[in-house]
Amino acid sequence: MSGFYHKHFLKLLDFTPAELNSLLQLAAKLKADKKSGKEEAKLTGKNIALIFEKDSTRTRCSFEVAAYDQGARVTYLGPSGSQIGHKESIKDTARVLGRMYDGIQYRGYGQEIAETLAEYAGVPVWNGLTNEFHPTQLLADLLTMQEHLPGKAFNEMTLVYAGDARNNMGNSMLEAAALTGLDLRLVAPQACWPEAALVTECRALAQQNGGNITLTEDVAKGVEGADFIYTDVWVSMGEAKEKWAERIALLRDYQVNSKMMQLTGNPEVKFLHCLPAFHDDQTTLGKKMAEEFGLHGGMEVTDEVFESAASIVFDQAENRMHTIKAVMVATLSK
C-alpha cells in the first residue's frame, strides 16, 4: 500500500472511496492473519508516540496491541505526561517527537492540534479522537458492518445514528457516508444536528456514491428499514451537572430501546455503540443518572438492547485494534 506511505490519518475526507476501501481490506486481512497465526510483522524497529490528552481504554489498548503485534515499540504520554501546549508549543513538540519517533497518535481536543502536529512532525500523525472527528472509530464501525452484512455493499446499507449528532461521532459518520454511499439517517432533535456546511458537503458526495444523508426528528420515520442503529453517550463526568438535566430532557425520546428496534421492521437489525455505554446502574455515572433522573436500566440505550443478540458492540471494540493496525501498517511500511 505504497500510496499510504507517510500519509497522515486525520479525518476520513482526506481519503478517496477507493483508499478507504483499501484500508478496510487491509484490516480484514490483518485480522484474519492474526487469528490464523500467520501475521507478519511489518513494523519491526519502529517507535510510536501515543499522546493522550484525554484518557481512553479502547484507543490506547488498540494502538498498543496493534503496535506490539507488528513489532513496534510505543511510548505512552498521558494527560500529565507531556508539556504539549502548556510549557511547550504544539509546533515544538511535533518537531521534537518527529526526531525520535516514526509515528505519532494524538487523542485530545481541537482538530487544529492534530493538524499542527502533522504539519511539523515530519512523520505520520494519526487522529485517535478530537473534538471534531473520530476517524479510527468509523473505520472499526465500517469493518464491523461489512462483517455482519457480507452480502451487501455499503450503498445498500442503512445506518441510523440516534441521539446527539453534533459531536465528533456525528461528523465522522457524515464523512463515512460521503465516501461509502451509505443511507445515513441522523435521528436527533434539531438542536443536536451537525453543522449545516458539513452536512451539505457530505450529502453531495454520498449521493455521488449511491447513498443519501437524512436528518430528522421523527424516530419512527428515521429508523424504518434500518440495518444498524447506533448511539453514543449523552453526558460525561466532565460536564457540569446542570447540563445533565438539559441533555436528558432533550434526548430521552431518542433512547435506543426495544420499541425503537422494533420500529425498524427489520428482525435482523443490529445495535452499535462506540463505548463506553451507560446501559445499567453499574457505573458511577450510571448510578447517578438512575438516582437523579430515574434512568434505571440504561440511559442512551437500555440494558435489554445492549445485552441482546442484536448487539455487536464488542465486535466493534475488537475491530478498533485491527483497523488501527491497518492504518499504522499502511502509513509506516512501504
From Swiss-Prot:
The keyword Amino-acid biosynthesis applies. It is found in: Cytoplasm. It is an enzyme of class 2 (transferase). GO terms for cellular component: cytoplasm. The keyword Cytoplasm applies. Pathway: Amino-acid biosynthesis; L-arginine biosynthesis; L-arginine from L-ornithine and carbamoyl phosphate: step 1/3. It catalyses: carbamoyl phosphate + L-ornithine = L-citrulline + phosphate + H(+). Keywords: Amino-acid biosynthesis, Arginine biosynthesis, Cytoplasm, Transferase. Gene3D superfamilies: Aspartate/ornithine carbamoyltransferase. L-ornithine binds at N168, D232, S236, M237. Pfam families: OTCace (PF00185), OTCace_N (PF02729). One of its GO terms (biological process) is L-arginine biosynthetic process. Carbamoyl phosphate binds at S56, T57, R58, T59, Q83, R107, H134, P135, T136, Q137, C274, L275, R320. Belongs to the aspartate/ornithine carbamoyltransferase superfamily. OTCase family. PANTHER family: ORNITHINE CARBAMOYLTRANSFERASE SUBUNIT F-RELATED (PTHR45753:SF4), ORNITHINE CARBAMOYLTRANSFERASE, MITOCHONDRIAL (PTHR45753). This is Ornithine carbamoyltransferase. The lineage of its organism: Bacteria, Pseudomonadati, Pseudomonadota, Gammaproteobacteria, Enterobacterales.
